[in-house]
Amino acid sequence: MSVLSTDLTEIASRLCSAGKGILASDESPSTMGKRLVKAGKDNTPETRRQYRGLFYGAELGGAISGAILHPEALDMKLDDGRSFVEALHSQGIMVGVKVDEGLEPMEASCGAYEGETSTKGLETLEERLATYHEKGARFAKWRAAMPICKDEYRISRAAIEKNAAQLAAYAELCIAHGILPIVEPEILIDGDHDGGVYFVETRKVLGECMHALVQRGVRLDHILLKCQMVTPGVDWKGNGPWRDPATIARWTLDALRQTV
């Protein structure tokens, strides 16, 4: 199958090749800049090009099926003159692109809890997708981020519905442009809740996402769902079964089976 295929089922199959993973290398210039400055480097386009070239120019084809790029990187080249996209394609690696434009606060007046967010970028997405496809991208990533409220031990219904609707709209647009969408409804692990709370919220979030996707006519074999393991919050101090990886695996599978 060509790395420039437009068959979404084939793209999904290739990205899920046995023994390979997807390289998440879509750091924004500001996020990358913090690392560069810490290493004593200036955060300039040229420095970012050199940094990214270290891995896009490496021999990754044996372990990586796809690489998610920041939009800036689609136009950058290695020192030998090949574009990053060309270098990845030469190894049979599919190119993806981060398409969301970050998070923005939700208003309490809509029923959201303090600190909850939705994701920016839908307004300009269709135009950008056409450009990304022309540049060789065949899959995309959009991240929603939902914290579990420390007072309520849950995510507000408003945040769940808003983020699920945005993910579904994004997926529909991607598919229309021959780009496979990675749907990422991330539930943040901040907090002191146990795994049971996370399980309940995972079921709510995944269930609403599946509903929103189906409502828009999105075929589930034309997306990749990126979700997390069902775990306690990072500040949880308890003991017992939630310390056991087998428990986490079982509850994660249960959440997926009950919703997807």
Where are these regions (language model features)?
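Structured alpha-helical segments in the cores of large, soluble enzyme domains
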Residues: 122-139, 163-179, 205-216, 249-258
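Active-site capping/gating regions of soluble enzymes
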Residues: 193-260
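Active-site acidic/histidine proton-transfer and metal-coordination neighborhood
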Residues: 157-182, 186, 190, 195-200
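Alpha/beta catalytic barrel-like cores
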Residues: 1-137, 148, 241-242, 251-258
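Conserved, mostly hydrophobic/aromatic
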Residues: 44, 142, 183, 225
